[in-house]
Amino acid sequence: MDCLRKHNVDTVMHFAAQTHVDLSFGNSNDFTSTNVVGTHALLECVKSHGVNKFIHVSTDEVYGEVKDDGKDLLEDALLLPTNPYAASKAAAEMYVEAYRKSFQVPAIVVRSNNVYGPHQFPEKVIPKFSMLLQRGQQLSLHGDGTHTRRYLYAGDAADAFDTILHKGQVGQVYNVGSSDEISNFTLCSMLLGQFGLSNETKEEVYKHVVHCEDRPFNDHRYAVDGSKL
């Protein structure tokens, strides 16, 4: 609150969150504390101080799994989270919407695909795999590697948030989507190629992969329609 007043803040973009899905299965209380209680605390500050826009950064995972033959989801699709991380982000969204309606907090919600880019913390799959390859270590692959994700470059994500900051409408939800959907196995293969390692066949890829136990529940894919933005 003191920071908002001291610097006369008129816009808040709320990125802060615990985001490592694997950790949420074994330490879900921290995710509730950070993602839900933390968002609630920030909303209280914003309600008291007053801002022009409160942009809440959520995730495509709040929609839950999208079947292989399913259509890309629009912003009005049901929220059906399947892991503790996604549930905490969906719960945070409910607080944001409640404060928008009850206290006129000028909120906007953004749900994006997986973002990647330089200097990303290595709990995320692309920097994690890159770091392992730099060290000459094997890549850990959940299950059979057929799960797919869509990836969004950090610079493109920044452009989307800049657009929402300047043109986004209060009360709206915006998907920030990518069409770059690849399986985890294909991601392994692509990174091996970038490091000059053999990846022409499955057998060559598997030489650099160790299969690990899958998550208690692992959404096969996510797919959002970002045409609104």
Q: What does each model-found stretch correspond to?
A:
Residues M1-V115, N184:
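N-terminal Rossmann-like NAD(P)+-binding domain of SDR-like oxidoreductases, especially those catalyzing
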Residues R5, E44-S48, E97-K101, M131, ...:
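Short, well-ordered alpha-helices that flank and scaffold nucleotide-derived cofactor binding pockets
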